[in-house]
Curated annotation (Swiss-Prot):
Region feature (Interaction with GSK3B and acts as a GSK3B inhibitor): 115-139
InterPro entries tied to this protein: GSKIP, GSKIP_dom, GSKIP_dom_sf
Superkingdom, natural source: Eukaryota
Pfam families found in the cross-reference section: GSKIP_dom (PF05303)
Keyword terms: Cytoplasm, Nucleus
Species of provenance: Macaca fascicularis
Membership in a protein family: Belongs to the GSKIP family.
UniProt protein name: GSK3-beta interaction protein
An MF annotation (GO) of this entry: protein kinase A binding
Length: 139
């Protein structure tokens, strides 16, 4: 199952919040990728052990680096650009220029491929949110 949304952002049973900062990368003006990276971190921090924007790797208008430790305790360095996110290293603040990994349009898609525990946490959060919406609808 590929998860491509954040269950915490469900605004109703019929759709997701409009205007989210992470609604795709294409068609956007040049952004400060550090701000985008912070938004990515805040979106999925609930489903990983640790995640933060790198303070030692250079961030610019067109690139930012995010360190993530999955619930399986695997560490990755992610590169965020207009093209999306990809793994660039297998430890915090590590960039391996020879590593050939695919870009993912969303952090959800990337983590879905890296971490079975992320998928489980995502699914549980989605279920809890849907149950809360159902309870709210019955009251």
């Amino acid at each position: 199952m590929e998860t491509d949304c954040n269950p915490m952002e469900l605004s109703s049973m019929s759709g997701f919040e409009e205007g989210s900062e992470l609604n795709g990368f294409e068609g956007t003006d040049m952004k400060d990728m550090r701000l985008e990276a912070e938004a990515v971190v805040n979106d999925v921090l609930f489903a990983v052990n640790n995640m933060f924007v790198s303070k030692s790797l250079r961030c610019a208008d067109d690139v930012a680096y995010i360190n993530v430790e999955t619930k399986e305790r695997n560490r990755y360095c992610l590169e965020l650009t207009e093209a999306g996110l990809k793994v660039v290293g297998y430890d915090f603040d590590q960039v391996d220029d020879h590593l050939q990994t695919p870009y993912h349009e969303t952090v959800y898609s990337l983590l879905d491929t890296l971490s079975p525990a992320y998928r489980e946490a995502f699914g549980n959060a989605l279920l809890q949110r849907l149950e809360a919406l159902k309870r709210d609808g019955q009251s």
